[in-house]
Amino acid sequence: MSVPDATVVKAFLLDLQNRICAGLEQLDGQASFAADSWTRTEGGGGTSRVLTQGAVFEQAGVNFSHVTGAAMPASATAHRPELAGRSFEAMGVSLVIHPKNPYIPTTHANVRFFIAHKDGADPVWWFGGGFDLTPYYPFEEDVREWHQTAKNLCLPFGDDIYPKYKKWCDEYFFLPHRNETRGVGGLFFDDLNQAGFDKSFDFMQAVGNGFLTAYAPIVERRKETPYGEREREFQLYRRGRYVEFNLVYDRGTLFGLQTGGRTESILMSMPPLVRWQYAYTPEAGSPEADLYDNYLKPRDWV
């Protein structure tokens, strides 16, 4: 299958959405996902699946979208100006999970496929995606296990893959105005096509399939950890960083808004509750300070 085949990619993505939702429902044990299918006037559509007020997850959204358009938006051609004016097809699964318990990290994952067409020319295509972890009260064993899972799924594709995409993740999920990373990273890749369609698709599948393998053990380990108002207030404050990053820097959010995407689905990543506090500084030696001192800068975890 050397020729890019969007049909097999779409089939995988729909199955991935189903499997991830089933896995999250099992972890929660109480709530289930509601499905909301939508169509886009310019072409395409998708299904947003959202779980709210569960026993474990305050809100979890797992979105599938498949959109088409006559011309690529500015967000997609900013670093590929030669693609301006091409028609495009974009599909992917994107998820964000906001747990109730502050000891369970927030997480985000995304896998996507993009193909651009022009009469008389070969299609230009690529895969992208990754997953990342945003703890509030981090445990080093959780972070190391998360990165070990990421490294393990990369190894069949080459020894250089994990370090490369781990570094890209650290650089991408960074808030310059705060001078801190959004969390402890994971994997991030984009413009993946150099190895040909089959191998590139294999890697995208490995990342998508690896997400629950990495996240589920952390949820199981931390979901019964007792917490109080202090931890909840800090969790809500740190969720503000998620909002800041997604609305100011995230390419996917900008792409969705610029292509006339479905606003409810694009902003599904927003936490249901969040707070800001003027000039907050954690108390020295506190668990909150541990996050700032040891986890919000790139580190080698494995």
UniProtKB/Swiss-Prot annotation:
The protein's required cofactors: a divalent metal cation
Pathway the protein takes part in: Porphyrin-containing compound metabolism; protoporphyrin-IX biosynthesis; protoporphyrinogen-IX from coproporphyrinogen-III (O2 route): step 1/1
GO terms for MF: coproporphyrinogen oxidase activity; metal ion binding; protein homodimerization activity
Location(s) in or outside the cell: Cytoplasm
Ranges for region Important for dimerization: 242-277
Binding residue positions for substrate: 94, 110-112, 260-262
Pfam families, alphabetized: Coprogen_oxidas
Chief site of localization: cytoplasm
Binding site for a divalent metal cation: 98, 108, 147, 177
Site (Important for dimerization): 177
One GO location term (cellular component): cytoplasm
EC numbers: 1.3.3.3
Matching InterPro entries: Coprogen_oxidase_aer, Coprogen_oxidase_aer_sf, Coprogen_oxidase_CS
Active site: 108 (proton donor)
Catalytic activity: coproporphyrinogen III + O2 + 2 H(+) = protoporphyrinogen IX + 2 CO2 + 2 H2O
The protein's enzyme class: oxidoreductase
Keyword hit for Transcription: no
SUPFAM superfamilies assigned to the protein according to its UniProt record, in alphabetical order: Coproporphyrinogen III oxidase (SSF102886)
Family, as annotated: Belongs to the aerobic coproporphyrinogen-III oxidase family.
Quaternary organization: Homodimer.
Task performed by this protein: Involved in the heme biosynthesis. Catalyzes the aerobic oxidative decarboxylation of propionate groups of rings A and B of coproporphyrinogen-III to yield the vinyl groups in protoporphyrinogen-IX.
Protein name (Swiss-Prot/TrEMBL): Oxygen-dependent coproporphyrinogen-III oxidase
Organism in which the protein naturally occurs: Shewanella sp. (strain MR-4)
Gene from which the chain derives: hemF
